[in-house]
């Protein structure tokens, strides 16, 4: 066994402490007046969220362990334990992963990225803008954030080489951070574009029967945390990573004709986007649209994703992880853990129906702090079970409370909160220190400018009193 595998790091010590506390809760006698399943549920939830947050074992292993332990200790009925598997969020992810494979395999993603970057000038500032725009544009057609990162970071590095930005140059770091944040942060405003959005949609449906529509979600979030956040990323890159191009940018657009597979996938994506945008009219969930698009990609004769591609490249681990996170939310409610925690947390928050601005800031702060403690993907699993109590305390509609969680997990402070961002900076050779300075600056810009704008926009749309 390598020596490094035996070193007890802070995450491993934390996971060990979490496991010990979970076992104590599981074996402890039930306090008077409590239902026995409250402590069992608390132990299971602490184990799952603690191990998801520390990452000492792969997330899918934690997810499978969660399902196994939940079934063994009978913490809830089977339909609650496995509620995540029947959620539309899970199947939206499933279909999106298949489409993501097709976008990469056919080369359409690379063609789209190259053509978009070729529309801009040869200066550093222009290419930073191009990288952000490509990241946002791909968010509409490629649901996987990790897929967008893996596709675009190599393009950013190739552009850096053409512009004369060698290792260690600010320009190289700037292009990588433009891609890393441009593929994640504005995409939070697009419902099917990342995992936390899909988890939130799934928990809202599982817990409250609420269905988010693509168009309404886009209208609420995209003008501010989509468009204005992209602009903030642009200026943050130029502030922290100023540089000037030295090389000559080659034309990046593909000159070869589109292949048959690229054309077919283009038609599939256009139809999929149209159905997503018009879901308020036809009433079909984005999940079933995404799943149908994935099935079309797999059909014999179309073969945008071959059997071998599906078997070797489909990210089953992500599906298991999302199912587990959604089921955690269901158990928080069914076991009574949510009620017990809410009864103790809510009195500590400065919530009053007479102070909507304070309530708005407090709910966003709650989401942001949760993201720091448990990473951004955990926020839509941890907080939604408390949403009804928070709605009562603030006087906000339930959907408004749920939407504030989006602003919470989109306001990230450190790179570790978002796994795709960590992957991007590793692929791009950006140190955690440099990336951390960037995300802190972006968080400050968000708090000072974008969140107040969001408050005004939400009030204009009628989401806030």
Q: Where are the predicted features?
A:
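Juxtamembrane and boundary regions of transmembrane helices in multi-pass small-molecule transporters
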Residues: 2-28, 145-148, 166-173, 177-181, ...
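Transmembrane alpha-helix interface/packing and boundary motifs in multi-pass membrane proteins
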Residues: 50-58, 134-144, 181-191, 275-281, ...
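Flexible hinge motifs at transmembrane-helix junctions and intramembrane kinks/re-entrant loops
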Residues: 31-39, 46-64, 81, 259-263, ...
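Juxtamembrane helix-boundary/capping and inter-helix hinge elements in multi-pass membrane proteins
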Residues: 74-75, 105-108, 118-123, 159-172, ...
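Re-entrant/interfacial helical elements at transmembrane boundaries that shape
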Residues: 66-67, 113-114, 146-161, 176-177, ...
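Core transmembrane alpha-helical segments of multi-pass membrane transporters/permeases
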Residues: 61, 82-110, 136-137, 141, ...
